[in-house]
Amino acid sequence: MKPRHKRALIIIAALIAIGVAALLILNALNSNIALYVTPSEVAAGKAPQGQAFRIGGMVKDGSLKRDGLTVHFVITDLAKDIPVAYIGILPDLFKEGKGAVIQGRMNANGEFIASEVLAKHDENYMPPEAKHALDQAQKNGSAK
């Protein structure tokens, strides 16, 4: 085999390897993406079907119920409420009336099955998407 052919073969093999690596990286990134939606968007059917996503808002006052390690509560954007079930230990800062972001999937009964619960970490902090959604919900609620 001539050196020219060897060089071409090496270049082709390198391009194939780079292409395979890029596909694997994109596949891994795509499977780990968790879109953020609000309770109003979930109620409107805009939530991703069959894939994990994040839902954020406020934990509704009086909705927190514990049954062993299973916790049931309602997440709200002050316009729509979504029931949530979580099995595990909640973060220390998780409280009723406070902001939270929950990752998981919707089940067939319309309940959000959480795999991860994140509580806001500062008295004044709220994810920008959640703050915007709450502001919009309050604005729409006061316009009625």
Swiss-Prot record:
Keyword Transmembrane helix: yes
SUPFAM superfamilies membership: Heme chaperone CcmE
Record's keyword terms, sorted: Cell inner membrane, Cell membrane, Cytochrome c-type biogenesis, Heme, Iron, Membrane, Metal-binding, Signal-anchor, Transmembrane, Transmembrane helix
Pfam entry (one): CcmE
Molecular-function annotations in GO: heme binding; metal ion binding
Segments in the Cytoplasmic topological domain: 1-7
Stored NCBIfam families: PRK13254.1-1, PRK13254.1-3, PRK13254.1-5
Protein name as it appears in the record: Cytochrome c-type biogenesis protein CcmE
